[in-house]
């Protein structure tokens, strides 16, 4: 891979995509291509086909997705399933048909069974049932993983899937209706402090365990995948260390300086016990 290779990063303005862009720029890659959603609707197959024909990228990195936390996944299952399948299918199939030989697909640890043994291993994929609160997103992502595997198997192309653990970083989503747990907690404790609210109520029991990874650190794995011909079709990306949601909440509360109490709404779902 030469530094002048044309690399298209789908979702380049998001938390993950922008981290990858920064990582590649810092390594001297000078021919990066990105499009905003207003410039290129990735759900539109013809638009994606036309884009590939015009730009002719040598490598595609798919960091584009419709994402959200438990609440958003629960409320909009059809959108999370169909929009993600449209986005990734158009990108993967379009890249293959356009002659792209290297494709890096970014997924999520939610593709693994709800009660998969720990630590999560790639071989656990499709061995048991998924967590119901995000199965629609997970099914879409599994489809992307298997599409890349199929192209790899049938056409011997370097189509690889990277499954990061729970990510946080710059340009994260802090909308309480659609965000993931860490940014949601940051906002709740911050607003409680500035509004002088003594208590913060959080979802679930606080007992589930989560592993977290800074998006810019995850981006280094994408650079590695770009610069090396990896022998397998699927790789997990993480730190190997996790914390309980309760520990996360207490850490965020301490850092922000909120002095009140934390209450847990056990009627709300916990999600996967550990991932």
Segments predicted by a language model, with ranges:
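Conserved catalytic-site region of short-chain dehydrogenase/reductase
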Residues: 70, 105-120, 136-142, 154, ...
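C-terminal substrate-binding subdomain of Rossmann-fold SDR/epimerase-dehydratase oxidoreductases
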Residues: 10-15, 19-27, 191-275
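Short-chain dehydrogenase/reductase
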Residues: 81, 85, 133-145, 175-183, ...
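Conserved Rossmann-fold NAD(P)-dependent oxidoreductase catalytic core, especially the SDR/UDP-sugar
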Residues: 89-134, 160
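Flexible, glycine-rich beta-alpha linker
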Residues: 111-113, 136, 160-184, 208-209
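Active-site Tyr-X1-5-Lys
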Residues: 132-165, 184-195
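Adenosine-cofactor binding site in Rossmann-like domains, unifying the SAM/SAH pocket
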Residues: 25-50
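NAD(P)H-binding glycine-rich loop region in Rossmannoid oxidoreductase-like domains
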Residues: 45-85, 97, 114
